[in-house]
Amino acid sequence: MSTAGKVIKCKAAVLWEQKKPFSIEEVEVAPPKAHEVRIKMVAAGICRSDDHVVSGTLVAPLPVIAGHEAAGIVESIGEGVTTVRPGDKVIPLFIPQCGKCSVCKHPEGNLCLKNLSMPRGTMQDGTSRFTCRGKPIHHFLGTSTFSQYTVVDEISVAKIDAASPLEKVCLVGCGFSTGYGSAVKVAKVTQGSTCAVFGLGGVGLSVIMGCKAAGAARIIGVDINKDKFAKAKEVGATECVNPQDYKKPIQEVLTEMSNGGVDFSFEVIGRLDTMVAALSCCQEAYGVSVIVGVPPDSQNLSMNPMLLLSGRTWKGAIFGGFKSKDSVPKLVADFMAKKFALDPLITHVLPFEKINEGFDLLRSGKSIRTILTF
């Protein structure tokens, strides 16, 4: 029996208040309006940014259905939708690509002007498709993937290879692409170069994969948790260092290790002190440092501008600089062609109802990526 055009009742993980567990609730998901797509979720990853919403580090309106890294199957489409059809395998896009704004038309930019910022908590038209206990529930980044069904705008979804395993390629929706693109697209890592990667979680490991794919000769992983070193080396790090093993600042250690500074450095933690350390450890005349980790909302950085005057470049990007709707299908095709692996990033698979266990694994440092299956 077709559910198209009807309200669907399903389970979703609702966050009612900060610093509290998610609550599995029955929610009502309205049908898609014009230029919207309703998706049956198959798999969703747990990303650190979702946890930042729980902790309040990132401010989102509550109650909210979080989640932004996922894959599913189109259940129904609204009027005027042309890029996907019911039955298509898709990945929701937390950065949309309208194709019409000044950013979408620019060859480099990817932060589409239709981007649904966290404080909005709605669809593009300013309303919600979720109801629970008679109340509207906020959306998250236009995706809200911690629900058995979600509704997204057409500019926020990409059709992918029909043969792709959704429980793996869901990582292309955020973590993998963010890291990999930071190396190959944002930093533009060069053959034979030396790279330093601060933070060896799922995104940091994806940066390492990107550095390796770009032909870096030396890739130094940096983390205070030495349990992460083996996995980092498995995906391409040539060596790993723990800042706690040294009396001097880590930027000095790395500068000495690399005979004057690394060519490329990446901060994949979201801490202000490590952002400056990553910038400082790259070669003063031509080094490039990329901010990948999401910093706390309300903090400002103080640094010495001489670090830049000498010739360093400091960059940042969201979603690895990739234009989402164009790039996600290509990245999935590359995965299917075995150009990179996603298995090393997946440490746990849990049923969606055990979402709080998945977040506990993330917070305790026991997981790289936990995939929730629906």
Curated annotation (Swiss-Prot):
Cofactor needs: Zn(2+)
SMART domains: PKS_ER
InterPro entries, alphabetized: ADH-like_C, ADH-like_N, ADH_Zn_CS, GroES-like_sf, NAD(P)-bd_dom_sf, PKS_ER
Catalytic activity, EC: 1.1.1.1
Stated name of the protein: Alcohol dehydrogenase S chain
Cofactor binding: number and manner: Binds 2 Zn(2+) ions per subunit.
GO molecular function: all-trans-retinol dehydrogenase (NAD+) activity; zinc ion binding
Subunit structure: Dimer of identical or non-identical chains of two types (E and S) coded by 2 separate genes at different loci.
Binding site for NAD(+): G199, L200, G201, G202, V203, G204, D223, K228, V292, G293, V294, R369
Modification type N-acetylserine: residues: S2
